[in-house]
């Protein structure tokens, strides 16, 4: 009988390994080891991965051994020792230490280069014209100032001119005929106890003035400062109040004095006393009898009363009243 070589399967080798591991170690043939080495040489090292080409511990360990190879470096060139100079030169240090003086002044450094802006020819011509005009104006002003400064100023006070006598051209008749307008009424209402005194006519006043004394000019009436006799000239000492310091003679009349001259009393409360107005009560039943007494139509009387109730006391006083004589004279 011929001998037949039987290739062991992985399962048989695993079983034999598990079964014979207790008795003897596994023996692998040299041909299998060579075959595995060839296969490993064909596969590039970058594509080797234990997940793709099996999970055996041998493959993984071989990959780690290939990656962790020791690289021997070439020996470096010979070191050339640097020759040190035999004579050492020591620098001499100064004995005196000179401290640097700090300057208090801050020196601002100016930039060395100027920024030059390029301009067109038109702009350059305009700027030149403006500069020429400005120079001309400055020259004119300087010439005017020099001409003004050349004329010497007259120092000293100007001589006072003699005061001219003012002659009043306004006649006394014109002064009397044009009095200042008064805001007071000509006559107060009847309910005022105190009334204004009757105003004199301007014509009568001028006649009295003309008959009493001849007309005099205003310049004759005014007093000169030499003619005024003050207590200081008489030798009297007078304690002036602050109000009298500005004016020695006070010609202003007080309001109470002027009121006293007009109404005869200075008590304002008595001047403003008024009579109580009379009140009449008129009933609707009395209207017919009142109309017959006044000889007026009843409806007309009612209309007049309605109108008067809406008016004030001042409006009623200003209302024009027609007398019976005027109505009779009209044809």
Swiss-Prot record:
Q: Which gene encodes it?
A: mei-P22
Its main subcellular localisation, reduced to a broad class, is nucleus
Task: Name the keywords, alphabetized.
Answer: Chromosome
Q: Which family does it belong to?
A: Belongs to the TOP6B-like family.
Per the entry, what this protein does is: Required for formation of the mei-W68-mediated double-strand breaks (DSBs) that initiate meiotic recombination.
Cellular location of this protein?
Answer: Chromosome
Swiss-Prot/TrEMBL GO biological process terms = reciprocal meiotic recombination
Query: What is its induction?
Result: Expressed during early meiotic prophase.
Q: Which GO terms describe its cellular component?
A: chromatin
Q: Where is the composition biased (Basic residues)?
A: 152-167
Polar residues: bias regions: 168-181
Q: Disordered: where is this region?
A: 132-187
Q: Does the keyword Secreted apply?
A: no
The source organism is Drosophila melanogaster
What name does this protein carry? Meiotic recombination protein P22
- Extra info from the record? Despite weak sequence similarities, may correspond to the subunit B of a mei-W68/spo11-containing topoisomerase 6 complex specifically required for meiotic recombination. Retains some of the structural features of the ancestral archaeal Top6B subunit (AC O05207).
């Amino acid at each position: 009988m011929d001998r037949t070589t039987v290739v062991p399967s992985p399962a048989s080798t695993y079983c034999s390994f598990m079964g014979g591991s207790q008795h003897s170690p596994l023996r692998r043939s040299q041909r299998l080891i060579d075959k595995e080495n060839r296969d490993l040489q064909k596969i590039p090292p970058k594509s080797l991965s234990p997940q793709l080409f099996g999970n055996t511990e041998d493959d993984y360990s071989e990959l780690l051994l290939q990656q962790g190879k020791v690289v021997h470096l070439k020996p470096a060139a010979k070191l050339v020792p640097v020759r040190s100079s035999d004579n050492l030169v020591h620098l001499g240090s100064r004995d005196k230490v000179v401290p640097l003086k700090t300057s208090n002044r801050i020196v601002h450094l100016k930039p060395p280069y100027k920024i030059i802006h390029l301009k067109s020819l038109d702009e350059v011509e305009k700027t030149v014209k403006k500069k020429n005009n400005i120079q001309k104006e400055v020259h004119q002003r300087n010439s005017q100032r020099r001409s003004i400064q050349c004329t010497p100023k007259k120092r000293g006070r100007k001589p006072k001119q003699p005061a001219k006598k003012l002659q009043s051209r306004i006649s006394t008749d014109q002064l009397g005929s044009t009095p200042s307008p008064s805001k007071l009424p000509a006559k107060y209402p009847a309910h005022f106890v105190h009334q204004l005194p009757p105003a004199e006519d301007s014509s009568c006043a001028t006649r009295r003035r003309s008959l009493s004394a001849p007309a005099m000019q205003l310049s004759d009436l005014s007093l000169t400062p030499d003619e005024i006799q003050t207590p200081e000239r008489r030798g009297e000492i007078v304690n002036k109040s602050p109000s009298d310091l500005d004016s020695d003679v006070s010609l202003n009349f007080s309001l109470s004095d002027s009121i006293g001259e007009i109404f005869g009393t200075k008590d304002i409360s008595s001047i403003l006393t008024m009579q109580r107005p009379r009140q009449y009560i008129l009933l609707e039943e009395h209207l017919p009898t009142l109309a017959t007494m006044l000889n007026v139509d009843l409806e007309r009387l009612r209309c007049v009363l309605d109108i008067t109730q809406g008016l004030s006391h001042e409006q009623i006083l200003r209302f024009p009243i027609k007398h019976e004589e005027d109505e009779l004279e009209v044809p």
